[in-house]
């Protein structure tokens, strides 16, 4: 695009200088459109292309990373910008940017890479230089032979002259090409580059070769002495490795195994000096005799001779110039040779293995370096995929990039007449509106400046709403309705199109949604493609790489598991307590209940304190729950055992009773009912006196298996005593038992004769307490239900507290008892008479949930007032 268009002298150059000075709009008053079109056609531009190029280049200054090229359309006498601005608008440039600056930098970088970092075809040049240096060395060796001295000298002179020109030109190119690096720019940077060791070597070899070539093959003393400098060509072999890769590799191997090498060299040196000293002591006074019997000079005359012998021997060279003569010396030499040779040869093995490992590591590193480009491409594609998300309206930089590279034309109404617009399709209209769009470089969109190309010079120009830079930024932010409306207006030739705002200046706000969707699809495909390429580069290089990957994965898994465990502990563990240490509640040994104390009596008993604090971790809480479940099991076992013992004692008291059978008349049946009521009061009196003398009266249960279908007891109590001291006393219990289930005091059916206090007197009426008498009298309208619990039913109960019986034939009286007794046979733990139909609670709660100290006024019939 670097074409400059000649414009009339009166035309302002602000539009062409938009890249450096901010870019103003072209002045339409500077010349007519025809003259401008002629001038543009002279330089090979279509009408309007000058403004396109100028606008595109002016807007390019705002894009980060674009080249700042000089725009066209500048007048010869136009005043230049006093000072250019750099790429980041921070560093002012002292001179304008050259047109061939990019090409100059590209050639400079290419030469620097070929000389300093040879790859590909550059290796051929370095191979040629190596052959030249090797030929000079061979010819220098041949000059030492008398028969080849003359011929080899002539060829050596020609080859050295050629080598001087080659090396001189190469050195100059190296100094010049070093400017592509920022640290070697300027003359100071060039001096810094020339002070490098290899550059100093090149300078030294060039200086030494010039006088050798100058004197030629002269036979004087000066020429002969200068010819010795030819062997400095050997130093040129060092320049083959400009980057010092071999030396770096050797140094890294030595540094990696420095401890092993120092150990081997240290022990080998000790073996050398000790063996040499002992051999010197033994062999120093032994004279050497030749074949004629004459004494010769001693071989181990000094300690230095012994050190020489020891070094040659332990290094396994063995010149044989010095050997021990005595058997003592030979024995010492053999012993120390076996020890010292192994330590002298050990560094060679260490260096060999170290170099092999380093070479393998370099190959692996090269394999890993191949992942850099796919990784960078994947990161770039991932960001562009994220930035083109339609939901992220705040990310506009990526869309602006596409605005600068995707060309999307506008429509000019002067290019489309009404007849043509009706015949041409949309694609033809697009091509017609931008005839030279395909020839522009860089795919920069250049919106047309209609003001500069008017049909009539006398037509009044319209004011431009925004400058060129703003128009370029929003060039492709056009809505679909604006696009179709503008094309419609341009095709139909509507004179009101300009009034609507779609003639010269489009109200462009956003890109077409279809174009955005296409760009989004391309971003997704590129992201998946780069992701696939990056996964292909992640293939393991060798078995060691596989092991390292598995090890890294295992460590990562362990770290994640540890992190999860820490998070779980943080979730289930409360924060640090604020209570001081000396006031914290401590936990001691597990609390055990006394053998004669019910655990339900005092469930919350303070535990003794110790110096330990409770474990608040998740495992500690599991242990705590398990301990509590174990304690609950022990309590249930205790309750079941106590209840079974209680049932056994009740069975002992009623074992002797046997009810009469075969009632023949209603009178006899009524008499048996009265007798059954008397038996009930007798049992209540007997049980109330079996406990401790000071214990309060309480009602307990009688097993129902002793009750028959035709009487209260399975057998008639023919031998039941109604008086005397033995009738009120039974076997004393070892301790005061407390039943675990609340006793149910339900009276017999209304057929009984408990309707008045007069009928209350029976065989044991004198043994019933006043409270019991009032309770029996008050509840005389309901049958008495004595619960029957055996061991089988306790095992069938899930908790031991809900006790039931499933014998339907247990009934009271000849008629089988009441229906309420068959439905409600048990009272569960925590259940009160509120849950039963005939009773409602009234009064204060009992003193103990076990039945001790039950008030007689608690239970009142639900149908009677108290």
From Swiss-Prot:
Membrane topology type, per the record? Answer: Multi-pass membrane protein
For whether the record's keyword set contains Cell membrane, the answer is yes
Q: Which residues lie within the membrane without crossing it?
A: 303-315
Annotated Gly residues bias: 11-25
Where does the record place Polar residues bias? 837-866
Q: Where in the cell is it found?
A: Cell membrane
Swiss-Prot/TrEMBL keywords: Cell membrane, Ion channel, Ion transport, Membrane, Phosphoprotein, Potassium, Potassium channel, Potassium transport, Transmembrane, Transmembrane helix, Transport, Ubl conjugation, Voltage-gated channel
For this protein, the activity regulation entry reads: Phosphatidylinositol-4,5-bisphosphate (PIP2) potentiates the activation of KCNQ channels by enhancing the electro-mechanical coupling of the voltage-sensing domain (VSD) and the pore-forming domain (PD). In the closed state of the channel, PIP2 is anchored at the S2-S3 loop; upon channel activation, PIP2 interacts with the S4-S5 linker and is involved in channel gating. Calcium suppresses KCNQ2-KCNQ3 channel currents, with calcium-bound calmodulin inducing a change in channel configuration which leads to the reduction of channel affinity for PIP2 and subsequent current suppression.
Q: Where is this region: Disordered?
A: 1-42, 574-617, 656-676, 757-866
List the SUPFAM superfamilies hit by this protein, alphabetically.
Voltage-gated potassium channels
Span of the signal peptide: none
Q: Name one Pfam family in it.
A: KCNQ_channel
Q: How does it assemble?
A: Heterotetramer with KCNQ2; forms heterotetrameric native M-channel responsible for the M-current. Interacts with calmodulin; the interaction is calcium-independent, constitutive and participates in the proper assembly of a functional M-channel. Heteromultimer with KCNQ5. May associate with KCNE2. Interacts with IQCJ-SCHIP1. Interacts (via the pore module) with SLC5A3/SMIT1; forms a coregulatory complex that alters ion selectivity, voltage dependence and gating kinetics of the channel.
According to UniProt, the name of this protein is Potassium voltage-gated channel subfamily KQT member 3
Species for this entry? Bos taurus (Bovine)
For this protein's source organism, the top of the classification is: Eukaryota, Metazoa, Chordata, Craniata, Vertebrata
């Amino acid at each position: 695009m670097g074409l400059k268009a000649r414009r009339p002298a009166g035309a302002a150059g602000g539009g062409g200088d938009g890249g450096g000075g901010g870019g103003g709009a072209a002045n339409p008053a500077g010349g007519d459109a025809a003259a401008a079109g002629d001038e543009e056609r002279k330089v090979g531009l279509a009408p309007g292309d000058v403004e396109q190029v100028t606008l595109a280049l002016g807007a390019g200054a705002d894009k980060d990373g674009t080249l700042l090229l000089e725009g066209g359309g500048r007048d010869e006498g136009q005043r230049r910008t006093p000072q250019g601005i750099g790429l980041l608008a921070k560093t002012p440039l002292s001179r304008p940017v050259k047109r061939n600056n990019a090409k100059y930098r590209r050639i400079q970088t290419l030469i620097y890479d070929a000389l300093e970092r040879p790859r590909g075809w550059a290796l051929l040049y370095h191979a040629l230089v190596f052959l030249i240096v090797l030929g000079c060395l061979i010819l220098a060796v041949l000059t030492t032979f008398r028969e080849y001295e003359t011929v080899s000298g002539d060829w050596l002179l020609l080859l050295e002259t050629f080598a001087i020109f080659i090396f001189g030109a190469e050195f100059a190119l190296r100094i010049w090409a070093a400017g592509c690096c920022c640290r070697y720019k300027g003359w100071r940077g060039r001096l810094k580059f020339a002070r490098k060791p290899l550059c100093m070597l090149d300078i030294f070899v060039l200086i030494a070769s010039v006088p050798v070539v100058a004197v030629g093959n002269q036979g004087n003393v000066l020429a002969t002495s200068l010819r010795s400098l030819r062997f400095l060509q050997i130093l040129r072999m060092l320049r083959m490795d400009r980057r010092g890769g071999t030396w770096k590799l050797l140094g890294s191997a030595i540094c990696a195994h420095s401890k092993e090498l120092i150990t081997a060299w240290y022990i080998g040196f000790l073996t050398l000096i000790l063996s040499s000293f002992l051999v010197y002591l033994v062999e120093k006074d032994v004279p050497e005799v030749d074949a004629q019997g004459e004494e010769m000079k001693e071989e181990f005359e000094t300690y230095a001779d012994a050190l020489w012998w020891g070094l040659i021997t332990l290094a396994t060279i063995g010149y044989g110039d010095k050997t021990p003569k005595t058997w003592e010396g030979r024995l010492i030499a053999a012993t120390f040779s076996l020890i010292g040779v192994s330590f002298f040869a050990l560094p060679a093995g260490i260096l060999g293995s170290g170099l092999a490992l380093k070479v393998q590591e370099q190959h692996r590193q090269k394999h890993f370096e191949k992942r850099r480009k796919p990784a960078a491409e994947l990161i770039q594609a991932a960001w562009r995929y994220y930035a083109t998300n339609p939901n992220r309206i705040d990310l506009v930089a990526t869309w602006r990039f596409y605005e600068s590279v995707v060309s999307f034309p506008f429509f000019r109404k002067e290019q489309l007449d009404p007849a043509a617009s009706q015949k041409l399709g949309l694609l033809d209209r697009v091509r017609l509106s931008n005839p030279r769009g395909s020839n522009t470089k860089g795919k920069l969109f250049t919106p047309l400046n209609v003001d500069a190309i008017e049909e009539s010079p006398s037509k009044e120009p319209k004011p431009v709403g925004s400058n060129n830079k703003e128009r370029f930024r929003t060039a492709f932010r056009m809505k679909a309705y604006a696009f179709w409306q503008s094309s419609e207006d341009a095709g139909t030739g509507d004179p009101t199109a300009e009034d609507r705002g779609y003639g010269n200046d489009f109200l462009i706000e956003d890109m077409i949604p279809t174009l955005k969707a296409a760009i989004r699809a391309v971003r997704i495909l590129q992201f998946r493609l780069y992701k696939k390429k990056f996964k292909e580069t992640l293939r393991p290089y060798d078995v060691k790489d596989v092991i390292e990957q598995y090890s890294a994965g295992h460590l990562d898994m362990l770290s994640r598991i540890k992190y999860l465990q820490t998070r779980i502990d943080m979730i289930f563990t409360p924060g640090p307590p604020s209570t001081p240490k000396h006031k914290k509640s401590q936990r001691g040994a597990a609390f055990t209940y006394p053998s004669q104390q019910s655990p339900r009596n005092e469930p919350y008993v303070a535990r003794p304190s110790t110096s330990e604090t409770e474990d608040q971790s998740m495992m500690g809480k599991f242990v705590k729950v398990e301990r509590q479940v174990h304690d609950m099991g022990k309590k249930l076992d205790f309750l079941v055992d106590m209840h079974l013992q209680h049932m056994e004692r009740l069975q002992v008291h009623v074992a002797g009773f046997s009810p009469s059978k075969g009632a023949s008349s209603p009178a006899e049946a009524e008499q048996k009912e009265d007798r059954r009521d008397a038996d009930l009061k007798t049992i209540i009196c007997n049980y109330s006196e079996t406990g401790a003398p000071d214990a309060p009266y309480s009602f307990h249960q009688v097993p129902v298996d002793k009750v028959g279908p035709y009487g209260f007891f399975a057998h008639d109590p023919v031998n039941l005593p109604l008086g005397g001291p033995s009738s009120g006393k039974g076997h004393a219990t070892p301790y005061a038992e407390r039943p675990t289930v609340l006793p149910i005091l339900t009276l017999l059916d209304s057929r009984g004769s408990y309707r008045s206090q007069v009928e209350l007197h029976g065989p044991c009426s004198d043994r019933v307490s006043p409270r019991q008498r009032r309770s029996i009298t008050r509840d005389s309208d309901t049958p008495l239900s004595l619960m029957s619990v055996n061991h089988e039913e306790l095992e069938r109960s899930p908790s031991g507290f809900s006790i039931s019986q499933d014998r339907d034939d247990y009934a009271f009286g000849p008629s089988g008892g009441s229906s309420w007794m068959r439905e409600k046979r048990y009272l569960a733990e925590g259940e009160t008479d509120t849950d039963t139909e005939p009773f409602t609670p009234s009064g204060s709660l009992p003193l103990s949930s076990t039945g001790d100290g039950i008030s007689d006024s608690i239970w009142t019939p639900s149908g009677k007032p108290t």
